[in-house]
UniProtKB/Swiss-Prot annotation:
It comes from Mycolicibacterium vanbaalenii (strain DSM 7251 / JCM 13017 / BCRC 16820 / KCTC 9966 / NRRL B-24157 / PYR-1). This is Orotidine 5'-phosphate decarboxylase. The active site is at K95 (proton donor). Belongs to the OMP decarboxylase family. Type 2 subfamily. GO terms for molecular function: orotidine-5'-phosphate decarboxylase activity. Coiled coil: none annotated. The keyword Lyase applies. Pathway: Pyrimidine metabolism; UMP biosynthesis via de novo pathway; UMP from orotate: step 2/2. It is an enzyme of class 4 (lyase).
Length: 277
């Protein structure tokens, strides 16, 4: 199997640079006429799988599945498998982060041979970037990707992410240090498999020009990020940004055709970001 960075580049070149979210929020379940239980969760997920087949990347939000306990995890496992069988790259939005053996256990679950393992997973570096090493190692061994939270759009994040660590290069924020650490992991690869997460609505994003890896850009659409305003975010090159959209598309459901049409409109809106628009 080729590395995740290569698989992602191929998928977005063929199918467009867009990541579609599966976020089964209780309000959406009710809006779709589904129950706020495991059966409703399964119905919601099945509709999304049918609508999003043929797109490049789909991102299930793990927390909404966890809320239903073991039944929710069973639905998540089935959803990941169905998406991958349809040729879609799956990014598990789990945001895991810990140290030592606990991080290694998370790595086995989300980047090893577990039924939960997707093509890539999100991770939190705020116990120190080095704490992610077990995950980075496991992902590399299994040709999977990792997207590390760097600069998020929520206002609470700035107090940590925009801070300058004592002894750091003058002006280099914590978020920039995370991007730079990811770049070191990607060094020497044709296409790195360690990406970062940078919010679409940030006025001063970190510099990702030397990352040599993908940049997941959540917050497009309903959360305020404008598809037409993403070019060059953080110095990104063409083909590097992967905009992520959830609510803007999901509110078009539950009809599969309507949901797919909404996803296609968003894909068209961000097509200019690809390497071969």
């Amino acid at each position: 199997m080729s590395g995740f960075g290569d698989r992602l580049a191929g998928a977005t070149a063929r199918r467009g640079p867009l990541c579609l979210g599966i976020d089964p929020h209780p309000e959406l379940l009710r809006a779709w006429g589904l129950g706020t239980d495991a059966a409703g969760l399964a119905g919601f997920s099945d509709i999304c799988v049918a609508a999003f087949a043929g797109f490049a990347v789909v991102k299930p939000q793990v927390a909404f599945f966890e809320a239903y306990g073991s039944a929710g995890y069973a639905v998540l496992e089935r959803t990941i498998a169905a998406l991958r069988e349809s040729g879609v790259l799956v990014l598990a939005d789990a945001k895991r982060g810990d140290i030592g053996s606990t991080m290694a256990a998370y790595a086995s679950a989300w980047a090893g041979d577990s039924p939960l393992a997707a093509d890539a997973v999100t991770a939190s570096p705020y116990l120190g970037f080095g704490s992610l090493q077990p995950l980075l190692d496991t992902a590399r061994e299994h040709d999977r990707g990792v997207f590390v939270l760097a600069a998020t759009s929520n206002p609470e994040g700035a107090s940590v992410q925009c801070a300058v660590a004592p002894g750091a290069i003058p002006g280099r924020t914590v978020a920039q240090a995370i991007v730079d650490a990811a770049a070191e992991v990607n060094a020497g690869a044709a296409r790195g498999s360690v990406g970062v997460v940078v919010g679409a609505t940030l006025s001063a994003p970190p510099d990702v020009s030397a990352l040599n890896g993908p940049v997941l850009v959540p917050g497009v659409g309903a959360q305020g990020g404008r598809p037409e305003a993403l070019a060059g975010l953080g110095g990104a090159r063409r083909g590097q940004l992967l905009p992520a959209v959830s609510r803007e598309v999901l509110r078009a459901g539950p009809d599969v055709a309507a949901l797919r049409a909404a996803a296609e409109r968003m894909r068209d809106a961000v097509a200019y970001l690809g390497e071969n628009p």
